[in-house]
Amino acid sequence: MKLRGLYAITDSQLLDDGRLLPYVEAALRGGARLLQYRDKSSDQARRLREAESLRELCERYGAQLIVNDDAELAARLGVGLHLGQTDGSLSAARALLGRQAIIGATCHAQLELAEQAVAEGASYVAFGRFFNSSTKPGAPAASVELLDQARPRLPLPITAIGGISLDTAPGLIARGVDLVAVIHALFAAASAAEVERRARAFSALFEPA
């Protein structure tokens, strides 16, 4: 599948109390192309259960599930993987998951990390945070000028993450970003209907003018 569009990322605090599946389905209905399951808890049985349910939803809507920082879970479910800089070897994950798996890499604000990820077999690279982030307030800041440098040098899709909203996403897309990764601006909503509305609005930003 072409890696372009809205990249929805779950948050276990935002999506508690039974909201995970209905809110995720709303995001997929609204056009999210990738969904990252991000849950840092140690409850492996629950994580497996939730990830299996999310995989079924993604298959239904033609989207791709990406698991955050758990190569074994990704391999068990036959889905993609996203690795941070401290989440283990990208080349080892590629060997485990195979050539066809989608594997993304966090590169913060460093073009050198992105070039290394390309060499190790990444499917996409992620830069950020570009704006103030509720999820990772202490993450290194990235500038939009980084995108100007990265686009001609990287042969892979570029993901932007970090405090992205409907107001700020267009400027990033105009600079060559292929995927906008969104958490709060998508899922911090009062209803599933509102999540779907926001997802449709983000997805529309990628449509030809």
Swiss-Prot record:
Cofactor: Mg(2+)
InterPro entries: Aldolase_TIM, ThiamineP_synth_sf, ThiamineP_synth_TenI, TMP_synthase
Positions of 2-[(2R,5Z)-2-carboxy-4-methylthiazol-5(2H)-ylidene]ethyl phosphate binding: 133-135, 163
One GO cellular component, as annotated: cytoplasm
Note accompanying the cofactor annotation: Binds 1 Mg(2+) ion per subunit.
Protein residues bound to 4-amino-2-methyl-5-(diphosphooxymethyl)pyrimidine: 36-40, 68, 106, 136
GO molecular function: magnesium ion binding; thiamine-phosphate diphosphorylase activity
UniProt key word Metal-binding: yes
Any single biological process term in GO: thiamine diphosphate biosynthetic process
Reaction(s) the record says it catalyses: 2-[(2R,5Z)-2-carboxy-4-methylthiazol-5(2H)-ylidene]ethyl phosphate + 4-amino-2-methyl-5-(diphosphooxymethyl)pyrimidine + 2 H(+) = thiamine phosphate + CO2 + diphosphate; 2-(2-carboxy-4-methylthiazol-5-yl)ethyl phosphate + 4-amino-2-methyl-5-(diphosphooxymethyl)pyrimidine + 2 H(+) = thiamine phosphate + CO2 + diphosphate; 4-methyl-5-(2-phosphooxyethyl)-thiazole + 4-amino-2-methyl-5-(diphosphooxymethyl)pyrimidine + H(+) = thiamine phosphate + diphosphate
Binding site for Mg(2+): 69, 87
Coiled-coil features, chain-numbered ranges: none
Pathway: Cofactor biosynthesis; thiamine diphosphate biosynthesis; thiamine phosphate from 4-amino-2-methyl-5-diphosphomethylpyrimidine and 4-methyl-5-(2-phosphoethyl)-thiazole: step 1/1
UniProt cross-references to Gene3D superfamilies, sorted A to Z: Aldolase class I
CDD domains linked: TMP_TenI (cd00564)
Entry EC no(s): 2.5.1.3
Keyword terms of this UniProt record: Magnesium, Metal-binding, Thiamine biosynthesis, Transferase
Family annotation (Pfam families): TMP-TENI
PANTHER family found in the cross-reference section: THIAMINE-PHOSPHATE PYROPHOSPHORYLASE (PTHR20857), THIAMINE-PHOSPHATE SYNTHASE (PTHR20857:SF15)
Function, in words: Condenses 4-methyl-5-(beta-hydroxyethyl)thiazole monophosphate (THZ-P) and 2-methyl-4-amino-5-hydroxymethyl pyrimidine pyrophosphate (HMP-PP) to form thiamine monophosphate (TMP).
Protein family membership: Belongs to the thiamine-phosphate synthase family.
Name of the protein in its database record: Thiamine-phosphate synthase
